[in-house]
């Protein structure tokens, strides 16, 4: 699935846990999404998906969430974009 990353950020807290956000679009979807990423060690990630801005079409949101679960390349690209923002 084609995607475009609009913005990304990542930070570490005092306990060295990672917390990041990536705003992105998916081809054929009307809305932008924001994924919030959390990891205690930078290897295993929990996430929460939301619409970025106004709510959109629920069916598209559910497809986006399913895609994140199934498409490791997409998920890894979003994590990488957030991690790369720390290095700048």
Please tell me what each predicted stretch does.
Residues 4, 31-35:
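Short beta-strand segments
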Residues 9, 26-30, 39-41:
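Beta-strand elements of well-folded, non-transmembrane domains
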Residues 1-25:
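Negatively charged, low-complexity tracts enriched in Asp/Glu with abundant Ser/Thr
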Residues 36-88:
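Acidic, low-complexity intrinsically disordered segments
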């Amino acid at each position: 699935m084609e995607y475009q990353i609009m913005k990304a950020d990542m930070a570490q807290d005092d306990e060295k846990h990672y917390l990041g956000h990536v705003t992105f679009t998916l081809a054929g979807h009307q809305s932008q999404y924001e994924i919030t990423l959390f990891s205690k060690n930078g290897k295993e990630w929990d996430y929460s998906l939301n619409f970025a801005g106004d709510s959109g079409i629920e069916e598209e949101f559910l497809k986006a969430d399913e895609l994140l679960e199934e498409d490791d390349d997409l998920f890894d690209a979003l994590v990488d974009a957030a991690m790369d923002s720390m290095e700048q």
